[in-house]
């Protein structure tokens, strides 16, 4: 293994570490809220049910639009008929909720016992007259955010190839893919409208009936780094053209994202440089806290490279970017922007470690003593006990971090542990955090 010092070029390493991360079935938490007329049925064991209840904070009276189909010993030993059981559950769901689409989420157990969900779904769909989408968002993936990637890739197959009114199809139309809160998606739509580009649709759409038209005339662009499987499906199955752009995280990433889309559509971007400068000026109070500080990404949700690039632009030094999985083709534009940002800020390039070994990472953190470690929840308390400031990476997944106006939310999350410890020191309580 190379030493932990910084280098002048991006270096890529691959270790064989443990995947201390959430299960991908957690994607249900935000997708059922995004697709308003959907119902998610997770097919798994008691463990999956406990995870959904505890990790997602299910409220008894809220009646969320997802449920657990719990596999028992009789299911696993093939004593029960899977088709009949799933039919009974889906009929009950249709009667109680009447969703426009039912999404079956396969888990590790359905994978291990070779449950033929893809074979049963079309038969049952024809019988109950409700679309059934199958997504194997199991724990065999690299990161929990890839659960959304699996669901969206399955949704691609259900998108129409042609609009009802053919004459309204433009020669080139734009579809954005990735799940965002409605207000953030509206912000990005408005940014593109200011540049003279109309967004034809989003994947996923708020309603199943509003899924976008996908064909060879459609340009698609992702808004999250963990959607490589969806991008591949869009290109191979629906012949869409992928716009390879940095992701709209931070003012710099949002500007680069908009500029790349504008260049593809032969449109001159309007006042983007000035708009980015105004946003940076408004963030100066946070940036002053971060300038010259160091950060270490342990790797958890595949947002690491985009966040690291933004924090470098804020004046931070990034020692290492741990990432559970890196698709260099899908993130090529982001990697180029990271390299360019480090060069412009005159800081050493961080090394990127794919599938990091957590034990080795702890040793490197002990050597480097970063001001902040962005880590999964499993390592946060042990690092805090050793005097390292930490931030849970899962918070960035659920926070609104896309677009110009939400850059402040990213910095609010990043600076919170630094501000907290400074406040404790001012009170004379610094002995509590330095063991």
Swiss-Prot record:
Reactions catalysed: chlorophyllide a + oxidized 2[4Fe-4S]-[ferredoxin] + 2 ADP + 2 phosphate = protochlorophyllide a + reduced 2[4Fe-4S]-[ferredoxin] + 2 ATP + 2 H2O
Pfam families cross-referenced by the UniProt entry: Oxidored_nitro
InterPro entries linked: LIPOR_BchN/ChlN, Nase/OxRdtase_comp1, Protochl_reductN
Subcellular location field: Plastid, Chloroplast
Keywords: 4Fe-4S, ATP-binding, Chlorophyll biosynthesis, Chloroplast, Iron, Iron-sulfur, Metal-binding, Nucleotide-binding, Oxidoreductase, Photosynthesis, Plastid
GO CC, alphabetical: chloroplast
Keyword Nucleotide-binding belongs to the record: yes
Cofactor needs: [4Fe-4S] cluster
GO molecular function list: 4 iron, 4 sulfur cluster binding; ATP binding; metal ion binding; oxidoreductase activity, acting on iron-sulfur proteins as donors; oxidoreductase activity, acting on the CH-CH group of donors, iron-sulfur protein as acceptor
Binding positions for [4Fe-4S] cluster per the UniProt entry: 23, 48, 108
A single BP term in Gene Ontology: photosynthesis, dark reaction
Gene3D superfamilies the UniProt entry points to: Nitrogenase molybdenum iron protein domain
SUPFAM superfamilies for this protein: Helical backbone' metal receptor
Co-factor binding comment: Binds 1 [4Fe-4S] cluster per heterodimer. The cluster is bound at the heterodimer interface by residues from both subunits.
Enzyme Commission designation: 1.3.7.7
Pathway: Porphyrin-containing compound metabolism; chlorophyll biosynthesis (light-independent)
PANTHER family: LIGHT-INDEPENDENT PROTOCHLOROPHYLLIDE REDUCTASE SUBUNIT N
Family designation: Belongs to the BchN/ChlN family.
Primary role: Component of the dark-operative protochlorophyllide reductase (DPOR) that uses Mg-ATP and reduced ferredoxin to reduce ring D of protochlorophyllide (Pchlide) to form chlorophyllide a (Chlide). This reaction is light-independent. The NB-protein (ChlN-ChlB) is the catalytic component of the complex.
Record note on quaternary structure: Protochlorophyllide reductase is composed of three subunits; ChlL, ChlN and ChlB. Forms a heterotetramer of two ChlB and two ChlN subunits.
Name of this protein: Light-independent protochlorophyllide reductase subunit N
Organism expressing this protein natively: Auxenochlorella protothecoides
Protein encoded by which gene: chlN
């Amino acid at each position: 293994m190379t030493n932990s010092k910084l280098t002048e070029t991006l270096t890529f390493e691959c270790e064989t570490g443990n995947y201390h991360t959430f299960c991908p079935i957690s994607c249900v938490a935000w997708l059922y809220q995004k697709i308003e007329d959907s119902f998610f049925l997770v097919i798994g064991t008691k463990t999956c049910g406990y995870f959904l209840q505890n990790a997602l904070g299910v409220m008894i009276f809220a009646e969320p639009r997802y449920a657990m189909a719990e596999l028992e010993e009789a299911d696993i030993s093939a004593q029960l008929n899977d088709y009949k059981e799933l039919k009974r559950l889906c009929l009950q769901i249709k009667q109680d909720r009447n969703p426009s689409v039912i999404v079956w989420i396969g888990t590790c157990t359905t994978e291990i016992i070779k449950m033929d969900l893809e074979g049963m779904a079309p038969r049952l769909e024809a019988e109950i007259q409700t679309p059934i989408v199958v997504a194997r968002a199991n724990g065999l993936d690299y990161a929990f955010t890839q659960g959304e990637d699996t669901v969206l890739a399955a949704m691609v197959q259900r998108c129409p190839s042609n609009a009802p009114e053919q004459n309204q199809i433009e020669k080139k139309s734009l579809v954005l893919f990735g799940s965002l809160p409605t207000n953030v998606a509206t912000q990005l739509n408005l940014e593109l409208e200011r540049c003279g580009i109309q967004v034809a649709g989003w994947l996923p759409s708020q309603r199943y009936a509003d899924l976008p038209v996908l064909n060879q005339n459609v340009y698609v662009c992702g808004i999250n780094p963990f959607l490589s499987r969806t991008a591949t499906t869009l290109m191979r199955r629906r012949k869409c053209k992928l716009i390879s752009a940095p992701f709209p995280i931070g003012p710099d990433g949002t500007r680069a994202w908009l500029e790349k889309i504008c260049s593809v559509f032969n449109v001159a971007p309007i006042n983007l440089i000035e708009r980015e400068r105004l946003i940076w000026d408004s963030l100066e109070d946070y940036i002053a806290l971060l300038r010259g500080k160091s950060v270490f990404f342990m790797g958890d949700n595949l947002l690491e490279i985009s966040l690291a690039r933004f924090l470098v632009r804020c004046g931070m030094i990034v020692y290492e970017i741990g990432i559970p999985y890196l698709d260099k083709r899908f993130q090529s534009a982001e990697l180029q922007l990271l390299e360019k940002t480090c060069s412009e800020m005159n800081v050493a390039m961080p090394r990127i470690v794919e599938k990091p070994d957590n034990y080795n990472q702890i040793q490197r953190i002990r050597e480097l003593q970063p001001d902040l470690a962005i880590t999964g929840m499993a390592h946060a308390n042990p690092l805090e006990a050793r005097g390292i400031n930490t931030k849970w990476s899962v918070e960035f997944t659920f926070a609104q971090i896309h677009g110009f106006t939400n850059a402040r939310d990213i910095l609010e999350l990043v600076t919170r542990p630094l501000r907290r410890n400074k406040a404790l020191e001012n009170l004379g309580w610094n002995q509590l955090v330095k063991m």
